[in-house]
A protein has these predicted regions:
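Conserved Lys-Pro-Asp/Glu-containing loop-to-beta segment of HAD-superfamily phosphomonoesterases
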Residues: 133-160
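N-terminal helical cap/lid subdomain that shapes the substrate entry/recognition surface
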Residues: 1-84, 93
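Acidic, Mg2+-coordinating phosphoryl-transfer loop and its flanking beta/alpha structural elements
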Residues: 151-184
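Short beta->alpha linker loops
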Residues: 15, 40, 78-82, 103, ...
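Short, acidic loop-to-helix structural element flanking the phosphoryl-transfer center
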Residues: 71-109, 113, 133-134
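A short, structured active-site edge motif that brings together acidic residues
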Residues: 36-37, 117-130
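Core-facing hydrophobic residues within beta-strands of well-ordered domains
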Residues: 87, 119-121, 147
């Protein structure tokens, strides 16, 4: 079972919006007002980029700065719902557990240590926000996983699309970034 990190294991929607708005000032794109969050949850990553005027060629730098900002807030980030119980039950049942994230490995490790969740067999970190399918393929190869044996748990349209593209099973949570309607 491979989990996405941000907004699936770790609850950071609000922190993510705050950081996005800090980066908007720094990189010159539109802020996301809190009253627009519900609408934004219905958009794909590319759709949100278009709406806010985020240029693709700056995406890597913006993502890197976002990860830096997130590292300052990691001790304030809480796990989502009953995810701690679920992860512990899966581990106790003998499932191999992994994390696939665009966040940094040090941020993820700090979170796992804070909540005594060092139960994961691997953390695969990639700064690539778009093209998650290629990251999944690399993960499958690196950790010698068969697509038919993998369940990916995520919260975004891009997670669903990447799972379909790579032939892995997908479970979408509804408490994360994208709305229930958008990930069906």
């Amino acid at each position: 079972v491979v989990f996405d990190f941000d907004c699936t294991l770790a609850g950071r929607v609000q922190a993510g919006v705050e950081i996005l708005n800090i980066l908007a000032e720094e990189f010159g794109f539109q802020k996301l007002p809190p009253e627009d969050l519900a609408h934004a949850r219905d958009l794909s990553t590319r759709g949100l980029m278009r709406q806010l005027g985020i240029p693709r060629m700056k995406l890597h730098r913006i993502s890197k700065r976002g990860t830096e900002e997130m590292s300052k807030r990691m001790t304030d980030i809480q796990p989502f719902h009953d995810i701690l119980v679920i992860v512990r039950q899966l581990h106790a049942a003998g499932f191999r557990l992994g994390i696939l994230t665009s966040n940094s490995e040090p941020n993820v490790t700090a979170f796992l240590q804070q909540y005594d969740l060092q139960l994961f067999d691997f953390i695969k970190s990639s700064s690539k926000l778009l093209g998650k399918g290629s990251v999944i393929r690399k993960m499958l190869k690196e950790f010698q996983l068969k697509p038919s044996d993998v369940l990916f748990v995520g919260d975004e349209m891009r997670d669903v699309e990447a799972a379909q593209e790579t032939g892995i099973h997908m479970a979408a949570v509804t408490w994360g970034y994208n709305s229930h309607a958008s990930i069906q």
